[in-house]
Structure formats: structure tokens, C-alpha cells
Amino acid sequence: MDMPKPNPTILARKSQLLDRLASFLPREALIHDPSETRAYECDGLTAYKCPPLAVVLPASTAEVSETLRICNDMGVPVVPRGAGTSLAGGALPTEDSVIIGVARMTEVLETDYDNRFIRVQTGRTNLSVTGAVEEDGFFYAPDPSSQLACAIAGNIAMNSGGAHCLKYGVTTNNLMGVTMVLMDGTVTEIGGAHLDAEGLDLLGLICGSEGQLGIVTEATLRILHKPEGARPVLIGYDSSEIAGQCVSDIIKAGVLPVAIEFMDRPCIRATEAFAGAGYPDCEALLIVEVEGSDAEIDEQLETIMDIARKHDPVELRQSSSEDESKRIWLGRKSAFGAMGKINDYMCLDGTIPVNELPYVLKRIGEMSKEYGLDVANVFHAGDGNMHPLILFDANKEGDLELCEELGAEILKLCVEVGGCLTGEHGVGIEKRDLMLHQYDPPDLEIQMAVKDVFDPKWLLNPAKVFPLASSDTRRIAAE
Amino acid sequence: MTLPGRCPGPRSIFGTMKALAPTSEAELAEMVASASEPLRIMGGGTRPIGVPVNGQPLTTSRLTGVTLYEPGALTLVVQAGTPVEEVRKTLAAEGQRLAFEPMDHRGLLGTTGEPTIGGVFAANVSGPRRIQAGAARDFLLGVRFVDGQGQVTRNGGRVMKNVTGYDLVKLMAGSYGTLGVLTELALKVLPASHHTATITLSGLDDTTAVAALSRALGSPFEITGAAHRQTADGPQTCLRIEGFEKSVAYRAGQIQTLLADLGAAKVETDPDTNTTLWQDIRDVACFHDGEGDIWRLSVKPSDAPGIKAQVDGAEALYDWGGGLVWLRVPQNTHADTIRAAVNAAGGHATLIRGNRAGGAFQPLSPPIAALQDGLRARFDPRGILNPGLMGRAA
């Protein structure tokens, strides 16, 4: 993975930079000792590491603003960081960069049930946003599987999704307002407690911009009352094609489940050995969950099970208790952990049109054989967001490279059938160089023109999202 | 005789100037690239919102047709000039719909012509179901557009979840043709509901009504419409529930119990009556006839009654649980009166009908205005796409 060469002028001015930062930051908010900055050398994509020049952990929007103003003034690249759980290398530093981490900014600023929103500092974790309102019966809907650890700042940067977004949408559909600091230190307010912010939809633009347009320090998020109940049904098939057809029929029938999850045989076996959820040993497993009162759930599950039966399932099991529901989900939720127990793996995140599911699964199977690497599939079938897990051996020379090559081929396949490279993890550095498979140069040019407006010197989160060759001229011109 | 690529448009919108009406994206791109004067970008011209643009009209109304429809994947790809009505019929044939319930502006603005799907997204037009399903922009998956230099560009795709690169799809939604001319759109569609019930409370004052709507919206019973309106029979506070039959009946009962302290409620389950009721709210039918300027306010719901009370002679239709306020005020009511009330609370106000010479859109804070101007300068360096609309000087 190529990263831009560190700027020697910046490296040489390190002490001057630190002096300026130390002039207003409390001691604990500024980290520059190499033994301590090492903790920030990578995110969830651990294959790539690089310690930053320094790490700033501000406690307020004002401190973020002042830090950015100084970095902008001195031409120092800045890497924004939430909780560092990105699987795409979205928070990978460069040697000449300052990390601004929001980890100390975790306050709830306002909770308003009448108007159904919560305003938080963005270092707060996803799950603890729900934690702040659940006693009163409310929740924050987007639920990425890293929700225990991941921060709202990162959720906004990557426009994170989750298992339940089929019904509730992803981050962008639940974000009402932000306080965002631009690279030059300007503090902006966009949106708020009202719907549809004024002017151009900058909120929509910022969400998913991978920290390249500004640092979001506060967010107004939509909260909803929890449903009365939820219950999953487990459906097993002997072919993934039939499972795919079943998903399509459920959607067409007008039922809108909150989640439709899909696991294939390699994944079922690994999960079963790990979590013992009682999954059948079959080719394809669906977990379909619906919400409402008991009677409403019965009504919806009846429709779903009627559809499932028409496709001749090898297993059809409705959860009859809260305990059983938990066990059904336990298998799915521990899928990544289970795979990790038996192997090193790389998790992909392409999205495909739902109707292409059988073809894509068949092709992935063929490619897996070609490359000699096993692939397990577990994903959100309702919206076509695939998570193929490629198993490899990190200790075996050349295996990581082979795995990355297969990964790239699978993502290209997703694009070919009308899908995209990433559904919820983001581009980061991981898929940066594949962007030209998805977009033509003019399509990328206009995206880069957006960055020109927000960050004319191209200092924010360098070397992410765009192929290095495409953004080279801009970064060099800015130096 | 009609020249190729030109068509006589409705008089009230196009004025006397013949509109450019390309029949293909390539032709449109060529027209924009070779334009030597400002262009007034439009779909069917039924939503003349904002200060009228002084320029050569260019309409997408001849870019029509459904390119792809996958009911099982809930996706539709359609040309920008396709009539909304055609989209509605196509979806209805498969039991699906545009869940964000786009408003038809013709009644309120006295326009004629055919609303287009491109126009719906260019103005980010959403109806009552916005509170539950999301806005138009939440249903836009991908776009193709022609920027101010005539360059064809695409962003997004036709899948539900996509974070590949910057989300220009959202940026294009609600940009009123100021960043580019939409040519093709990929949409997420949803199943239509089998049953509908509307629970109506009568005689509530505005503050009590909005509080009642908030209580219902803060329940687990999935309200898909929450409005408060004045009728010949007095004020009505309406809550809509949709879904399968038993579920609708159950939730309607729960809502009645929840709001029992506010008097007896009436429950309407007749499909046609419900359709008419919510169409009237969606299209602001109560203000179609008669004089008066029309303002559209987006505010925090609980602030809405107080804001309305500050404007002399104002009548209000509250939608989105109070978050969307349609105000009818005496003609030429000074904009400052309304803006001051909205700004003090937070939110924004747009003058939809009335003398818009002083500006129609909410003035932006200086840093946001600078970003917006910067984006327009990048997407449209010559400043020829709807100059003057959305605040940027012509």
C-alpha cells in the first residue's frame, strides 16, 4: 500500500508545532512520545501501520478549532479519528500527520423526547447513545456490529449502517445536524432539531466523506421509540439461489422486516462450532426479524413463513422465546469472531442488486477455488450488502497479497453486476485504488472538486478515498 | 412549426421564450456546454420556487422513460423528465410506491403542466410520510447529471447501501438545478400498505395538538402521518397508521388509548377517504384558494405553535408532527417578521407563494454560504445554471 512520502519540512518543524499546540492544550491532551503515539499507528485494518507525528485529544470544539487552525497554518496533515475501528484504514496516519481524536468528547448535550432527538459530542460510542435513552424506551437506530466501541464521529465519517438498516436506514438517514470544524478552524453549524437543513444538503455531503471535509464535534441524532417486541425466524435452504429467491419474494410481498441476514455453509459451520446457536448444517441460512406487538409479529411471520415454505426449506424455525431469539442472533453476531478463531480473514463489504445474489455467490465460489482460498459469506441480504470473508494464513508468505488480489476481484464483480465497492465500511486506503473501477475520471474529478472547496490545501485525512495518482497533482500543488 | 429540440412550454412559466428541450443526455450536455447565457433549468415547471431566474429555459421533460425496474430489489431507474404520474402507475402495478409521498405543487402555486420525477428530487419534495419513511433525498440511490460545463457525471448507483466515495447524490437532491441538470435517477421504492387508518381528534388548540402529535410519534406505534389543520368544522388533529389489517386495527386502538385524555377520537378506515385526506394535507389544499403569501417553515415541532403566534394574521397547517408549518399570511407581510421568529427558535423558512423579489430561501450563515458558493463555483464555473436561485447572486 503506497502512502505519500512524509514532508521533510514538517518533520523538521515538529518541535515548533508541538510548542504551538502545547501553548493552549492541557498536558494530557497532547501525545507525542513515540512509545505512546504507537497506540495510534493503525485502526481496525491492522495490516498497515504508521505512527503519527503527534496525537491531540481535545475536550471541546474550541480546542479542535485551534488545533486545526495551527495545523492549517503550518501545512500539517490532520487525520481525524473516532474510536479507530475502521476496517478500511480510514484513520491510518502518515508520518507527518497529527491525529485529532475525539475520544474525550463523550458528553450528552441535550435529550428531547418530545421532538425525538439527542445531541451528543461525537466521541460518544454508538451503543452509549442508545444507552442514554433506553431507560425511557428510546433508541438510536444505526447499529454497526462494532457499536460497542465505535464512535459517532466515525459513524458520520463513514455513513455507517448495520443489521437493522433495511427498516431504519443508515447514519445519513438518522443525522439531523452537526457542529463541524473546517480545516482552517472555522466552526460551522448545519441543521439541528428540525428536518431537512437549509440550503444545499451539506449534511448529506459530509456524512460518508471519511473525515476529509471537516471534523464533526457534535451531532444531533434522530431517536425513536423502541418497538414493543421483535422476533426472528430461522430459514434454511439447500441452495443459495433458492434462499435468494425467498428474500426477493419476502420483499415483494410487502412485508418489511427489520433485518434479513444470510449465512452460507462455511460460515454456519464455523459459527456453530464457536457459538452453538443450533443452526442447521445447510447451504444457506436466513435470519429474518420482524417487529411489533406479539400479534403483529405473528401476522408478519405467518406471511414470511408461508413464502418460505413455498421454496421447500430444510429448516423453518420460529423463535418462541426471548432466549431463543437471542441464541439465533448470537450465531450471526459472533460470525466474525468465530471466523477469527479458526483463521486470519479479510472482510469485504461490496453491495450488489439483491436479484444478482445467486450469480454473485456462484462466481465467488468459483473464484475461491481458482485462488485456493476459502471464502465464507455472511451478509445483509435484504439490501444486498455482502460481507465475504476470505480466509488466509498471515504467517504464510504471499498469502495476504493473494487474499487482497482475490478481494479486489470480488469487489470488481460487485461493480460489474451493478453494485458498488463498499456498502458501509468506507473506501479508506483499502479500496482507494479500486475507485476507477467504479467511477470514470470525471466522476472522481467532481468529488475531488468538493474537497477543494472544504479543504483547499488537501490536508485533511490524506491519501484516503481517491487513488493516489488521481489526487497527486492536488496534494503536490498544495505543498 | 416546432423546431427540433424545442417545445412551447406553459405560458406562465416559460414566458415567451421557447424552452430548450433536449431528447437525450448527450444533446442536453451539448446545449449546456455551448450555452452563452444563463439557463433556467426546469422539469415540468410546476414548482417555480425562489426568485424567478432570468435566463433561457431548458427543460428535461423530454428525457422520459423507465430504464430499469426490479420490484424484488425495490429499485427503479428512471429518466429525469418522466412524469411523476407515470412513475406512480408503474409502481402501483407491482403494489409499490414512492414512500416519501411527494407533494404536487400545482394547486398551491396555480401552475399547470406535468410534474416530473427529476423536479421532485431537484427540490427534495416530500410529503406527510417524511416523518417515518424519510425525505425524497433518502430514497435517491444514484444520479446522472450534466454539470455547468456540459460534463456528464454520475454518482451513487442502484443499490441500497453505498458509501463508495462522496455522496453527491444527497448534494444533488434539493439543489434546484444549481449544481447540474439531473438526467437519470435511481430510486429506492417501497411496498404500498394494505390498510390505512386515520385517528382524528377535534377541537384542540395548536399547542395541545402538537403535544398530542409528539406523544403519538414518541410511541412504538409507527405513525406515518401527523398533522393539525383548520376545517369548517373546527381544528382537526390527524394521525395516520398504515400496514397489515390486524396491525393497523391494533395500533389505532393503542393510539386512542394513549390520547384518551384529549376527548373522543374518530377513526377513519375507508381507503378513498384516507387518500383524499392525506393528499389534501400533502398538497396544502386548505390554502389553494384565496389571497395571501405562503411560507414553508421547517422547525423543531414544539416551537411551531409559538412561531405561528408571533406572526399577525397567520393561519397554519402543521404537518410532520408540527415540524413542517405551512403559513398563510396577509399579502406582502414583511419577510423579517417571519424570519425573526424562525431564527430565534432555529430552523428555516422559505417563501413559496407571494412576492419573492426580496429572496425566497433562508439566508445562510456566512461560513455555510461560503461553502455553498464554493460548491456552485466548482460545479458551474460560468455561473449559468439557475443563477440567483438559492441565494447566490446572479
Regions found by a protein language model. Name each.
Chain A
Residues 1-479:
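Noncatalytic alpha-helical scaffold of FAD-dependent oxidoreductases
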